[in-house]
Amino acid sequence: MVKKVAVLGAGSWGSILANMLVQNGNDVVAWTNMEEQAKELNEQHSNEHYVPGFKYDERLVATTDLEVALKDVDAVLFVVPTKVMRLVAQQMVEVLKKTGQKPIIVHASKGLELGTHKRLSEVLAEEIPSELRQAIVVLSGPSHAEEVAKQDLTLVTAASSDLASAEAVQKLFMNNYFRVYTNDDIVGVEMGAALKNVIAIGAGALHGLGYGDDAKAALITRGLAEISRLGVAFGANPLTFIGLSGVGDLIVTATSVHSRNWRAGNELGQGMKLDEVIDTMGMVIEGVPSTKAAYELAQQKNIEMPITEAIYDVLYNEKGVKEAIDELMHRDGRSELE
């Protein structure tokens, strides 16, 4: 039974999940590499930069000491940016080597590793001891930290090739407002989680340019087709993409003002440059590196992904958003099912 949990990463999603796990009756330590953030969580029970105005459960403990966070843990939850996932995993392994602990490894991050384009469970599997690899679990689905903080109803998926581990995570997180389903398609769940951020940037850009619901619905639908094509090429179950971690996560990310990726696209649509958007937001926009990864993976697999390619051109080749949309609309006609 899981009772002691280390949450690695105390941004908006990590800190809210940690808070919920405390309220579910678990002993939880949140790890951050920022002393001031740990102090704020411990003393003011707040995390103003990430979740303004929210008061955290006083039982939640934060630390910058990884050994303290990992002491006697039954489960480790990674909620760190993709660019540091491997580094944090390496640091965790060094601690676990000293203690001999064998916790369930869970991650709730969404993206692909920069450079290698590997899924995050693959990154973790390369770093952790072999006996822990089979039990890696991915927690993903349509979920905003702001809504979970308010205890709005949220449903997600726990995916793992090991059913017992997925069910342990399901039990750990379930409560009267947070429901968890299990899935054995870890590839599809992670691909859906990463690639929906790309389409969300496009949806935000449409809004920024003033396009209506028809255009946004079309982009989301055709975007889902692209996500599914690429995911299936890497071994995903196509049915996963019509589930919570596929279309569910895509809808919420591509339509909500809570979504950083949607907000970034909205600013781009209004004429702001990418560097300005990143500086203004001050938080990770996972869809930006995920767009590059998706574009390059599509080239590698010879998969047609015109929307992804258009967003790539806007982000990396300084193409105007309106020009990119016009080019998409003037592509040759074809069957919808191609």
UniProtKB/Swiss-Prot annotation:
List residues binding sn-glycerol 3-phosphate: K110, G141, S143, K196, D249, S259, R260, N261
Enzyme class, top EC level, equals: oxidoreductase
The UniProt record lists the EC number as 1.1.1.94
Where is it mostly found?
Answer: cytoplasm
Which amino acid positions bind NADPH, per UniProt? S12, W13, K110, A145, R260, V284, E286
Supply the PROSITE patterns for this chain: NAD_G3PDH (PS00957)
Tell me a Gene Ontology molecular-function term this record carries.
glycerol-3-phosphate dehydrogenase [NAD(P)+] activity
Q: Which pathway does the protein contribute to?
A: Membrane lipid metabolism; glycerophospholipid metabolism
Q: Note one Pfam family from the annotation.
A: NAD_Gly3P_dh_C
Quote the Gene3D superfamilies the UniProt record gives. N-(1-d-carboxylethyl)-l-norvaline Dehydrogenase, domain 2 (1.10.1040.10), NAD(P)-binding Rossmann-like Domain (3.40.50.720)
Q: Active-site residues?
A: K196 (proton acceptor)
Q: Where does this protein reside within or beyond the cell?
A: Cytoplasm
Q: What GO cellular component is one of the record's annotations?
A: cytosol
The alphabetized list of GO BP terms reads: carbohydrate metabolic process; glycerol-3-phosphate biosynthetic process; glycerol-3-phosphate catabolic process; glycerophospholipid metabolic process; phospholipid biosynthetic process
- Give the function comment from the record: Catalyzes the reduction of the glycolytic intermediate dihydroxyacetone phosphate (DHAP) to sn-glycerol 3-phosphate (G3P), the key precursor for phospholipid synthesis.
Q: What is this protein called?
A: Glycerol-3-phosphate dehydrogenase [NAD(P)+]
Q: Which organism is it from?
A: Pediococcus pentosaceus (strain ATCC 25745 / CCUG 21536 / LMG 10740 / 183-1w)
- Which gene underlies this protein? gpsA
